[in-house]
Amino acid sequence: MKIYLVGGAVRDQLLGLPVKDRDWIVVGADHATLLSLGYQQVGKDFPVFLNPKTKEEYALARTERKSSAGYTGFICDFSPTITLEQDLIRRDLTINAMAQSEDGEIIDPYGGKQDLENRILRHISPAFSEDPLRVLRVARFAARYHSLGFKIASETLALMTELALSGELQHLTAERVWLETEKALNEKNPEIYFETLHKTGALSVLFSEIDALHGVPNPVKHHPEVDSFIHTMLVLKQAVNLTENNPILNKSAVRFAAICHDLGKALTPQNILPHHYGHEQAGIKPTRSLCKRLKVPSYFQELAELTCEFHTHIHKAFELRAETVITLFNRFDVWRKPQRFQEFLQVCLADTRGRTGFETKDYPQIDYINQLLHSANEVDVQQVIADGFEKQAIKNELTKRRILAVKQTKTNYPTN
């Protein structure tokens, strides 16, 4: 029996990156052997064993044979005669198919180290195309390692495109698509994930609402980048910058809202382009459709839909009437969910800066709207009750006093 460290831990170690999770492969053993050594089996379909001391995951070396459509349609062989090389060849990319022996030797039968040095994401064998999930995984790795100069090999991109066109992607469950996508949203360059999926044709299959933005023009005066898909990717990049070092914000939710904020532009009638009157309200339906299909968590969906509807309100914050401001606050339920509103404001800032040449533009609207929020929050609910108001009258009076507080702040707010 031999044990090897495999996959991402070996890859990241060679890249000089911190190793988060360590996965191990056991060669020359079976279930009974590991159980007799005190390992605890978890998972029925695919047996993984927990080391009794470290609690790290160990798996028996295996081979896979395609048996039906989708990413689960495989027959596995866990025989003790399976070699390390046989186990490694079933993996997706060469850089993920390296192993390290217990004495520290790197085993690299498929050229992963060379591809690591050359910054190439390359598939190992034609069996790559047997698993449609790999299209998303490779796009996610491209997003993760883009800042290090990694590119997808042309032949791998061609295979991903074949897979996207084959109909295999339709067999992926919503949960798996969202899991990969949420992971991608947390990478350094999530825009690369969506751009890669667009290049391969997978975006139109899995994220048709986002893909529909491609080629939809905006007025060049306000959007020098013109194209709505390009703008959305620039907004996503800005959202990354704004959330990367802010532990308070739900960064993947902010980034998802950034992607959805202009989905309504794909529905703009041709005869009024490049203008997009009413795209805010129009964006709610495609956002809801996307979220329902991919079973996106409700928090993400709510933030994305509200962002679609109200992002231009913040752009025009200085023009809003006090009544409109309070309606906005009520729609976001800022009284009970203050963080969500701050996340929304970050998307609005990302939207402003996600335009070619506007990357460092000042956005005083956030300070202004937060001042109005502060004044509205100063209104004391208990005082309203103490003043004798009851039931619905409490809510009505509270709204009146909040509007008055906002009006006073608007009047006294310094303008340059």
Curated annotation (Swiss-Prot):
GO terms for biological process: RNA repair; tRNA 3'-terminal CCA addition. Mg(2+) binds at D21, D23. Residues 228-335 form the HD domain. It catalyses: a tRNA precursor + 2 CTP + ATP = a tRNA with a 3' CCA end + 3 diphosphate; a tRNA with a 3' CCA end + 2 CTP + ATP = a tRNA with a 3' CCACCA end + 3 diphosphate. Its cofactor is Mg(2+); Ni(2+). ATP binds at G8, R11, R91, R137, R140. It holds the Pfam family PolyA_pol_RNAbd. Magnesium is required for nucleotidyltransferase activity. Nickel for phosphatase activity. GO terms for molecular function: ATP binding; CCA tRNA nucleotidyltransferase activity; cyclic-nucleotide phosphodiesterase activity; magnesium ion binding; phosphatase activity; tRNA binding. Its EC number is 2.7.7.72, 3.1.3.-, 3.1.4.-. Gene3D superfamilies: Beta Polymerase, domain 2 (3.30.460.10), cca-adding enzyme, domain 2 (1.10.3090.10). Keywords: ATP-binding, Hydrolase, Magnesium, Metal-binding, Multifunctional enzyme, Nickel, Nucleotide-binding, Nucleotidyltransferase, RNA repair, RNA-binding, Transferase, tRNA processing. Comprises two domains: an N-terminal domain containing the nucleotidyltransferase activity and a C-terminal HD domain associated with both phosphodiesterase and phosphatase activities. Belongs to the tRNA nucleotidyltransferase/poly(A) polymerase family. Bacterial CCA-adding enzyme type 1 subfamily. Catalyzes the addition and repair of the essential 3'-terminal CCA sequence in tRNAs without using a nucleic acid template. Adds these three nucleotides in the order of C, C, and A to the tRNA nucleotide-73, using CTP and ATP as substrates and producing inorganic pyrophosphate. tRNA 3'-terminal CCA addition is required both for tRNA processing and repair. Also involved in tRNA surveillance by mediating tandem CCA addition to generate a CCACCA at the 3' terminus of unstable tRNAs. While stable tRNAs receive only 3'-terminal CCA, unstable tRNAs are marked with CCACCA and rapidly degraded. A single active site specifically recognizes both ATP and CTP and is responsible for their addition. This is Multifunctional CCA protein.
